[in-house]
Amino acid sequence: MWARNLMARALYDNVPECAEELAFRKGDILTVIEQNTGGLEGWWLCSLHGRQGIVPGNRVKLLIGPIQETPSGQDQPTSGLMHQTFGQQKLYQVPNPHSAPRDTIYQVPPSYQHQGIYQVPTSHGIQEQDVYQVPPSVQRSIGAANGPHLSKKVVTPVRTGQGYVYEYPSRHQKDIYDIPPSHTTQGVYDIPPSSVKVPVFSLPVGEIKPQGVYDIPPTKGLYAIPPSACRDEAGLREKEYDFPPPMRQAGRLDVRPEGVYDIPPTSTKPTGKDLHIKYNCDAPGAAELATRRHQSVLLNHAPSQLGQSPGAQNDAYDVPRGVQFLEPPAETSEKANPEERDGVYDVPLHNPPDAKGSQDVVDGMNRLSFSSTGSTRSNMSTSSTTSKESSVSASPSQDKRLLLDPDTAIERLHRLQQTLEVGVSSLMALVTTDWRCYGYMDRHINEIRTSVDKVELFVRDYLHFARGAVANASCLPELTLHNKMKRELQRVEDSHQILSQTSHDLNECSWSLNILAVNKPQNKCDDLDRFVMVAKTVPDDAKQLTTTINTNAEALFRPGPGSSHVKSGSENIMNSTEYPHAASQMPLLHPGDHKAQGLNKPLPPSLGKDQPPDCSSSDGSERSWMDDYDYVHLQGKEEFERQQKELLEKENIIKQNKLQLEHHQLSQFQLLEQEITKPVENDISKWKPSQSLPTTNSSVGAQDRQLLCFYYDQCETHYISLLNAIDALFSCVSSAQPPRIFVAHSKFVILSAHKLVFIGDTLTRQVAAQDICHKVMNSSNQLCEQLKTIVMATKMAALHYPSTTALQEMVHQVTDLSRNAQLFKRSLLEMATF
């Protein structure tokens, strides 16, 4: 069909993504052998420099049509191309199967090299058959004068010194052109309305306005041809409101609107108040007014009327009357008439915890602390409280879930955690070396008491949210995440028990100065000392639990469609800072209750089976080293080195793929493995101080300065190993290596950064100055969170390979890790020298 000697000029640079694709530069002349070769729409078989391959048809332009096999065909000067006829200047030539003229498909202005604007074709006979979409590179070429040309290849930063920088802004690399687009995609190229010279249809203005500002329909069609042009105006307004017609026409309260809520009508007797409303509201206007008044009364007196039957309340409100955000008082629920509690959506009273739940709490009391700063954590939280107290505090929240979307839940969680950290920091600011002397306590007793009360309140509010998140985790198919969160929650609950008890004891003694003021050191800790010691450990436990919830937010917080009305009806309460735990107070129907068995729609809806599995859970053969990665479980040097060795041996790329790796790759893996296995030194007696450190300030103690300098040298050594691992990973990504290669390289990156986290944890346990301890802890926690993000980004890059977007996101996260590691190393030096 096609002549063999078609010539085409390359319009853009092309970087091949596979071995069959040709690489060429802008301006190269290619020989077109076959168009749409092998049935691949938009791909041409071309030849360049003696090599054949496929090229994207929208990146080249045919020259002059078929050329006779004469030497003059290729020696034509390029300057003559600017003076060709209009039929030869088209960016795209669409072959017409009906032999129609091709000069009306795309009209390009003479200055298309600088503008790139297409005019709307006036012929519509073949617009739905032969449509070429504008590749993203054409749109990006407009700004080529302001920045470098962006290709579809993953861009990796360049190492400069001990950091990485992009040669140009890398965030523009997302969603770049991967595959020549299919012509079935709709609405890719927005055509300015001013470029339409000849209107397709003459429509009245009134029919166009309801469709929006732009006259390009959001559905079918690539050009300004409204598909709804033939509809009448009444048809456009059919979906103006979502209210069903029976809602507007209901003149009596006993007539149920169709399709509002699938609740069978109850057979309870209406109260006298409802009868008064029912028989005095014959007119529609009166019924609507009475309904509004009745609802306002219910909202104002909700706690006292929760025990009444749903029949006493109007069904126009989306939320069933039996389901409220606050629990009914015990006396109201117990004295309620059983006949009035037969509604389908009545919420049963909370059952006492079963034996299994109590046993879980008792087991949690005997747990070991796995915190990254575990050696500084006081063990009073487990030894000072009984299992009975802990089970009483934990059991009422086990059947309450949070019906929130992930974004709202994460935002609220971070707000609660930040409030808790600020409260503890305010309390710690009042704790000095002589803070228990009579003079200091006399001046600051009120401030200390206020801070103590705030810390206890902030911990309680945080626990309300955390218990709801743990309840959500209990509904997941895999219980791995639930068990982990329950252990982390137990630590916070243990601490809260001590805080509550000590705060109560302090209030019992009325914060007497004669009791609290101590003029000489004492060996025994009193209630105030216990409160301060336990409060100091709470932010670490809360940080660990927050990280777990944040990482698995997509699996934990996914309310079903039936919970949207609950959120809208309680939005003001749920978002109020005065009631941060309102969402966690929503009761659930007990699975064994006889009333719950007749429900077609459980409230709230449980997570479906089609929900993706939890990120932190893994099973069987699909478990990889990333699923086992949990860097917060650091105990000591021996366990740390053992864990590093296990992670390194698992899925060892050298042992599995020796025959498939090239020689330089094998040597690179072996070199990285040698650097990773280098241990972190803890023996400071063998360390020789560096002479290059500047003179220190006297504000840092000699022992703390020695520790900072010692671990700074350790950090410097392992930071170089981290940079080498990152270099190898970026080189692997740039050379388009498969997932099994770049995942193995990412393991070296994570293990190298893991050592920096271990250095930070060890230093936190050994320094004496509290401000240095907090700074090192914060930097170490940032590295921890960054490592979690990199693990997830690497998983996504491997699962969605060869997605450029996923690979680019992984590169961004690794680059951010290098910056955070450099800041961590620099902070150690600054604290040691200033």
From Swiss-Prot:
Region (Required for interaction with PLK1): 710-834
Modified-residue entries (Phosphothreonine), positions: 804
InterPro entries: CAS_C, CAS_fam, NEDD9_SH3, Serine_rich_dom, Serine_rich_sf, SH3-like_dom_sf, SH3_domain
Location of this chain's protein in the cell: Cytoplasm, Cell cortex; Nucleus; Golgi apparatus; Cell projection, Lamellipodium
Region (Disordered): 328-402, 584-624
Reported modifications of this chain: Polyubiquitinated by ITCH/AIP4, leading to proteasomal degradation. PTK2/FAK1 phosphorylates the protein at the YDYVHL motif (conserved among all cas proteins) following integrin stimulation. The SRC family kinases (FYN, SRC, LCK and CRK) are recruited to the phosphorylated sites and can phosphorylate other tyrosine residues. Ligation of either integrin beta-1 or B-cell antigen receptor on tonsillar B-cells and B-cell lines promotes tyrosine phosphorylation and both integrin and BCR-mediated tyrosine phosphorylation requires an intact actin network.
Ranges annotated as biased composition (Basic and acidic residues): 332-344
Cellular component, GO annotation: basolateral plasma membrane; cell cortex; ciliary basal body; cytoplasm; cytosol; focal adhesion; Golgi apparatus; immunological synapse
Domain (SH3): residue spans on this chain: 3-65
Disulfide bond in keyword set: no
One GO biological process term: positive regulation of osteoclast differentiation
Description of its domains: Contains a central domain containing multiple potential SH2-binding sites and a C-terminal domain containing a divergent helix-loop-helix (HLH) motif. The SH2-binding sites putatively bind CRKL SH2 domains. The HLH motif confers specific interaction with the HLH protein ID2. It is absolutely required for the induction of pseudohyphal growth in yeast and mediates homodimerization and heterodimerization with BCAR1/p130cas.
Protein name per UniProt: Enhancer of filamentation 1
Organism: Canis lupus familiaris (Dog)
